[in-house]
Amino acid sequence: MEMNLLQKLCVVCSKCNEYAMELECLKYCDPNVLLAESTPFKRNAAAIVYLYRKIYPEVVAQNRTQSSLLTLYLEMLLKALHEDTALLDRALMAYSRQPDRAAFYRTVLRLDRCDRHHTVELQFTDNVRFSVSLATLNDIERFLCKMNYVYGILAPEAGLEVCAQLLELLRRLCGISPVARQEVYVEGTTCAQCYEELTIIPNQGRSLNKRLQGLLCNHIAVHRPSSQSDVNIQTVEQDLLDLTTRIPHLAGVLSALKSLFSSSSAYHSYIQEAEEALREYNLFTDIPERIYSLSDFTYWSRTSEVIVKRVGITIQQLNVYHQLCRALMNGISRHLYGEDVEDIFVLGEKALDGEERMFVGSVFAAPNRIIDLITSLSIQAFEDNPVFNKLHESNEMYTKIKHILEEIRRPLPDGTGGDGPEGEAIHLRGREAMSGTGTTLMTASNSSNSSTHSQRNNGGGGRARGGGKKVVGGGVNGQDGDGSENGLRVRNCDEHEALDLVDARSRIHNVTREVNVRKRAYLQKVSEVGYGKVIRCIKTQERLTSKLIDVNLVGPLCLDFISKLMNGFLYRSQYHQDQDVVDVGDQFTYDEHLYVVNNLIHKSLPVESLPLLGQQIYELCNGPLFTHCTDRYPLSHNVDMAYACDNAGVLPHVKDDLVKCAEGTVYPSEWMVVKYMGFFNFSDCQDLNVLQKEMWMHVRELVLSVALYNETFGKQLSIACLRDELHPDRDVILTYNKEWPLLLRHEGSLYKSKDLYLLLYRHLSRPDESGDVPTAPVAKPSTLTAAAAVSGVFREPDRPWLPSPYPSSSTAGVSRRVRATRKRPRRASSLLDLARDEHGIQDLVPGSLR
C-alpha cells in the first residue's frame, strides 16, 4: 500500500531526528576522532543538503497556507540541520589546519555569541504598540497566551510576522537536539496545560494560584527518565570481543567493572527469612498469634522501604566506575588512533569541583543513578544528625521482626513452641508497637499496689506535688519529714486510715503510668509526623533534582500554539484579495443603514435570551488557543474565555469589565455604539485596555443586533468567526479585520462591509434565506408584481409605489408586537409597512424606496 503525503513527511521527520541526534553528539566528541571517521558525516551532510534544497521551500509554502505541528517542526529542523552541518564542517576544516580543541568547541557550540534573546514588536494601532523581550521557552508560551487574548485586535499580517519571529527564536533556542538545554526553560514556571490539568482535579480548598506555586511543569520540557539505569557489562564485553584479544589489558578492566556492583549487601537479610516463614501459612491453615505480628511488621517494613529508597551504590563506587570506563575508552582510543580521547567532558572535568561534578553527572552513568545517590546522601545526612537518630523507624521495625523470628525458632521448656506466657508477652508487645497508642488498663491489683507503696515510701512527694491533701481529706498538713514526732505519728495514722481509699482508686486507674504511657505515645506520634514531613520534603526535592539532572525533551506545546495562531491569521487574510467578494458599501448608502437601525432601535430583546447571547459574546471575544467548546465533552464558552484570561495574566478588574459587557442588555440604545462604516475601527484608541473594551462592545453589538434582527424580522441568521475555519453553514462571519470586518454568505454569494446594518439590509432585501420568491396566489398581474419579477423584490426607484393586493400588517390592524405576523411569508410591500406607523408617516422609508 502506497503511503500518503503525511506518512512520507513523518518518515522524513523521523530520519532527520535520527541524524540530528547523531550530529548533536558529534559536537562533544574529540575532533581528532571526527577527522579520522569523517566519511559517514560527509555522506549524511550531502543528504541533508539535498533535503534542504528539495523539501524546505515546499514546507515553508505549506506553512504559509495552512500550518500544522509537524510541518512547523520540519521547517525548523531542516534549517537548523543545514546550518549546524555547515558549521561543523567549517570547524573541522579549521581544526585540521590549526589543531585547537578549545577553539573547535567554542565554534560548534556557539560559545562566542548569544542569539537566544529576541525582542518582539507588537503594533495594534498607530498609537498603541509594545515591545516584549523573550529569552526562554516559558517566555514564548506565555507570550503566545497573551497574543491569544488580543487576537481580535491584532492585524493578520502583523500576527503572521510575529509567529514567524517566534518560530525563528524557537529554532535558535532548541537547535537540532530534541533534548532541551537547561538554560532555555525554567522548570518551576507553569504553563497553560498545567493550569488546565489543575482545573479538572479536586482543589481541596486551595486556590488555583496557590496550587500552581511550586509545581514542576512537564509540558514545556517533557521529562523522560532513562530506561536503562545499569550498564549491561555483558553487552559491552560482547561488543568488545574482537578488541579484547588484541588489547591485553581490556579484560582486566572489564572484570573490574563486572565485580564492582556484583557484591550485594547482606543488610537486613532476615527479611527474606521472615517472608519464607510466612509462605508456610495460608487461608486454610492455623495461624499463631506471632505470625500475625510477623506479617504486620513485614508489611510496614515494605512500606518503609517504599518511602525511603535504599540505593545500592556509594559515591566511591561511582567514582571508581567512572575511572574504569575512562580507562576502557582511552585503551581503545590508543589502540585505534594512537592517543587518549580528549573530548569536551575531559576538558570540563578540570574546571569542576566535587559537588559540581556530582550534579553535572558522568557521561558513563545513567542520570537516575546520580539522582538516587543524591537522594540517599540526603537521607543519610538527615539520619546521621544526633537529634533525629531515633526518628528513623526502619531499624526498629527490622529489630522487631528479628526478635519474633528468634522466638519462633527457639523452643520453650513446655514444648509448646512459643505459645507460653513469654510468647504471649511478645505478642502483646508487638500489638502495642503496632497500635502506637500505648494506652493500657491495669488488670492486676498487685502491680497497682506496688506502684502505690513505692510512691508513699518516697516521703510523700506525690502528695506534695498536688494530690496528697485531697486523698487524706485534710489530714495531711503538708509538713516534711523533719517535723515533730507527734506530727509524724498523726500523719502515719492518717495515711493508714486512707490506705484503702487510695488503693481502691489505684485499682481503677494508675495516673502516673498513664501519664508516662501517653507521653511516650505523644513523642512517638510527633516522631512519626516529623519523620514523614522530612521524607516528603526529600521526595519533593528528589523530583526537582530529577527534573534538573535527567533527560528533558522539548515539548510540543509552543509549536502547537504557534500553529493554531498562524492558522487563525491565515484564515482571516485568505479572502482579502478575493474578487468574488462583493462590497455592499458600493451598493447601499447611509439611508439603508438608517432604515435597519430605525426598525431595531425601538424594539427590545427577551430577557431570557441574554445568557445564551452572552456565551456567544465570549466565543467571539476568545482566540484560537482555548477551544474546549469543540471537544467530545464540550465546555461552555465562558470557561474557554476564563482559561484565556487567566493564562494571559489579565487583571481581575478587567475580567469584571468583560463579564459586564457579556451580560448584555435588552435595549438597543445601550449597545448600539458603532458609527456608520466604523465597525472594528479603533484608530482613536490611545490605550490597550480601552482598545480591548471597544472590541468587546463591537462584538456585543454584533451579537445582540443580529439576535434582535432575527427576532424582529423572523430570520435565522447565525454568526461565526474566522478563528479556525470558514463555516459554510453560518451567515454572518466576523473576520476581526479593519478593512472588511464582516462577511455575509447569502444565496451563494459572499458580501463584505464595514457596517453591520448594511449587511443586514442586504440580507433583508431578499424574500427569505433561500432566495425563493413567495408563491402566494395573485388575482391579476399588476405593475408591482411585474417589477418584482424583474428586480427580485423592490420596485425601480423611478416607479411610483402601488399598494399590495395582500393586506399588510398595518392595514390588517395587527400590532407590531404580535409575533404571529412575523412568521408568515411577507410580500415585498410588507417590508415597507414595517417602517410606517398606523398614521401613514413615511419619513423612515429610504428615498430610493418611495
Curated annotation (Swiss-Prot):
Motif (Nuclear localization signal): 822-827
Subcellular location: Host nucleus
Protein name: Tripartite terminase subunit 1
Gene that encodes the chain: TRM1
GO cellular component: host cell nucleus
One Gene Ontology biological process: viral DNA genome packaging
Presence of keyword ATP-binding: yes
Keywords for the protein's UniProt record, in alphabetical order: ATP-binding, Host nucleus, Late protein, Metal-binding, Nucleotide-binding, Viral genome packaging, Viral release from host cell, Zinc, Zinc-finger
Organism: Human cytomegalovirus (strain AD169)
Annotated coiled-coil segments of the chain: none
